[in-house]
Amino acid sequence: VIGAMFVKICGITNEDDALLAVAMGADAVGFVFAPSPRQIAAQQAYDITRRLPPEILTVGLFRDEHPELVVDTIHRAGLKAAQLHGHESPAMVEEVAKQVRWVIKAVVAGSPDARHADRFGTDMVLVDAPGGGGAGKVFDWTLAAEIADVPRLILAGGLTPDNVTDAVQRVRPWGVDVSSGVEKSPGRKDPLKVRHFIQRAREAAPPLHVGPDEMPYDWADDDW
């Protein structure tokens, strides 16, 4: 039985990889605007996102960026969601959420922000390894139990096709996020790894939805 599992492929740098992720069944694709080997310009992201189906959640990743710049970049790149991957305060997160439809707050496993993740009030919370954000590091998954009760928890940090089954079964997240774990080189995805990652994440998920949402979610809904 294939379970309900939100899957995001992050660190997209080119149209081929975005279309590959969508064809393989990803729910979301992510673009990095923070310093990284996978960093992309807003115009580049726009050229890719305008070719994607409306039901795909398109996400921009930022780290400790000014809320106004986050919002401006999201709009120029034609994205639907902002992922705040730094030490943003709840007030900064709220500023972004006023003008961006979906917001994901990333927290570090074992940190105070993770234990109090509900205070950010975001649509989704992503838990990453220390030094995460494409670093390919795995964290002690038992730390996920310390995270405040949030409606949609996305597990990241060193996930690969080889460990995603174990990760999903142990943590029972609402979704999973991968970047370097499905690459053949920095910024270039490996089609076989992408396919196996998505397939195994869904096979490991419980057949019933986790959390308050029915799956799949309609990311094309702009009524807010």
What are these regions (language model features)?
Residues V1-W224:
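Conserved N-terminal beta1-alpha1 strand-loop-helix module at the mouth
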